Design a protein with these regions (language model features):
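A feature for loop-to-transmembrane-helix boundaries and adjacent hydrophobic helices
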Residues: 1-149
Length: 149
């Protein structure tokens, strides 16, 4: 089930981040880049800011979606190692999140000098690695059991 959810979750993340952009939520750091935007009525002030929500929609959403779809359809990893694709999703999403957080207005509270999103993403990377390891162990045990028959 986790592998199937992993194939769809990035699309939801993409649309959610686009909604954040439209609503002027979770804005980026102040910036002078030519594509910076000003969010009116958002509490972000009148400074031009990185459209970090769109960066996240692209990286956490579209790029992760394409990667997961490729792994699901071309490599058939979900069929060969059930659970691994979910682990790969957690890792890919977390890496994308850590990168995108560089452009986002930081949280009021930092943990060990990094944003809460980056900190929690480190935990998701560990969780993803554990899922992959468990999927591989399960596949090896299942294969060993079948070869004895």
């Amino acid at each position: 089930v986790g592998d199937i959810v992993a194939t769809l979750a990035p699309a939801g993340l993409c649309f959610g981040r686009i909604a954040n952009f439209i609503n002027g939520e979770l804005w980026g750091k102040a910036s002078q880049v030519s594509w910076a935007v000003i969010f009116s009525d958002s509490g972000a002030g009148v400074q031009p800011r990185h459209p970090s929500q769109l960066y996240e929609a692209g990286l956490e959403g579209l790029v992760v979606f394409l990667y997961i779809q490729h792994r699901f359809w071309q490599n058939r990893v979900a069929q060969e190692h059930p659970g691994q694709l979910a682990g790969e999703f957690f890792i890919a999403y977390s890496i994308a999140r850590i990168i995108c957080e560089q452009f986002r207005e930081p949280d009021d509270v930092l943990i060990a000098g990094i944003s809460k999103g980056q900190f929690y993403s480190l935990g998701l990377v560990a969780f993803g690695v554990i899922l992959i390891m468990l999927a591989r162990i399960h596949t090896a045990r299942t294969s060993a059991g079948k070869s004895k028959d």
